Amino acid sequence: MANKQTVLYIDAGHGGLDPMTKEYLTPEKIGKKTLHTNGKAYHNNGWFYEGHFNRQIAKKFIEEAKKAGFHCVPVYHPWQDNSLSDRTDTANAMNQKFGTRSLFLSFHANAAGVGTAPQTGAEGVCSFVYKLGTETANLALS
């Protein structure tokens, strides 16, 4: 059973699709998109956009977490590409103001080229602890 005092700060990495132009808003120099040649549509004629996918996953997670009784606060813009430091600063400022028990969850997917770079493995979960005491850091990393 979820504690209604627990706040989940939800992050979705990279930018999304502009609702008016349908343009992918992660800067071209960063990439974060791949054209797939496997016949699947994905987001735009075979393109897979990390930031758009991350927002779809974050939205679904928020829906399910709210059903479980968690208070969810998205810290990402619906489509603009804000820096990770901006998103964590937002969560830290809100958490300091309200002083509640919280968790920061960041959703990321990688755009891997099926036709040009076949994948032979998968990535797992990473835990990062920032500005916490040793006991808390050890607990989070265990």
Where are these regions (language model features)?
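Active-site-proximal helix/loop segments of hydrolytic enzymes
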Residues: 3-8, 43-142
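Short glycine-rich His-centered loop
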Residues: 5-47
